[in-house]
Amino acid sequence: MEEEGSGCNVPRLPWASILRAALLLLLIGMVIYCFLCGQRFTQQQLDSTGWDLAELLLNHTESRQDPRLRWQGSPALGRSFVHGPELDNGQLRIQRTGIYRLHIQVTLTNCSSSTWTVMPRQATLTLGICSPTTHSISLLRLNFHHTCRVASQRLTPLAKGDVLCTNLTLPLLPSRNADETFFGVQLVRP
C-alpha cells in the first residue's frame, strides 16, 4: 500500500547548515579571543618583570688614578646594552627593587706569571654598592691569586637607587677586550 501524503512540498530551512556555520563562527571567535588574551597576558608579564638587565663593557681610559672601573653600554658597541638600569658616570644605577643576578669578569692586560713578582700581593677586584652611602656594602671580593683573570656571579637583593661600583687594585690595568672584561646584571625577581 502506498502512503498518502498531502502531495505538497513544504520548504525546509537548512537548519543543519545554519547551525554548523554558527558553531564554526563561535569556535573561530573563541580561538581569536584566546589568542588575543594570551598575547595581552604575555605582554603584561614582560612589562611586570621589566626585563631590567644590562651587559656592560669597560670604558677604558689610559691612566688610572682612581681604582674605580667605568663601564659603558650601547648596542653600537656590539654585545653591550642597558635596559632598565641606568649608567651614572660609568657606574650602574638600579631602577627597580628586586633580586638581581650579577656577573663580572676582568682580565688584566700584559699579564703573565713573570709579571706577578712586581704585582701587588693583594690584587683584588671588588664589586659593591657604593651609593647611597647608608646602604654601602661589598657584594663580591675576588682575589687574583697569581692569575690574570677573575670571574664570578651571585644573586643579591638590590634596591631602587643603588649604584654598583667595581674597584680594581691600582696600578693594575684591565683588558679592553669585550670577551675578557665585562659586567652585567639581570633582574630575576621583583
From Swiss-Prot:
Glycosylation sites (chain numbering): 59, 110, 167
GO terms for MF: receptor ligand activity; tumor necrosis factor receptor binding
Membrane topology, record value: Single-pass type II membrane protein
PANTHER family xrefs: CD70 ANTIGEN
Family: Belongs to the tumor necrosis factor family.
Annotated ranges, domain THD: 52-188
Physiological role: Expressed at the plasma membrane of B cells, it is the ligand of the CD27 receptor which is specifically expressed at the surface of T cells. The CD70-CD27 signaling pathway mediates antigen-specific T cell activation and expansion which in turn provides immune surveillance of B cells.
Originating gene: CD70
Cross-referenced InterPro entries: CD70, TNF_dom, Tumour_necrosis_fac-like_dom
GO BP annotation list: adaptive immune memory response involving T cells and B cells; CD27 signaling pathway; T cell activation; tumor necrosis factor-mediated signaling pathway
Main localization of the protein described in the UniProt heading: membrane
Subunit annotation: Homotrimer.
PTM annotation: N-glycosylated.
Cysteine disulfide partners in this protein: 111-148, 130-165
Membrane topology (Cytoplasmic): 1-17
Cellular localization per UniProt: Cell membrane
Membrane-spanning ranges: 18-38
Protein name per Swiss-Prot or TrEMBL: CD70 antigen
Any one of the GO CC terms: plasma membrane
Extracellular side: 39-190
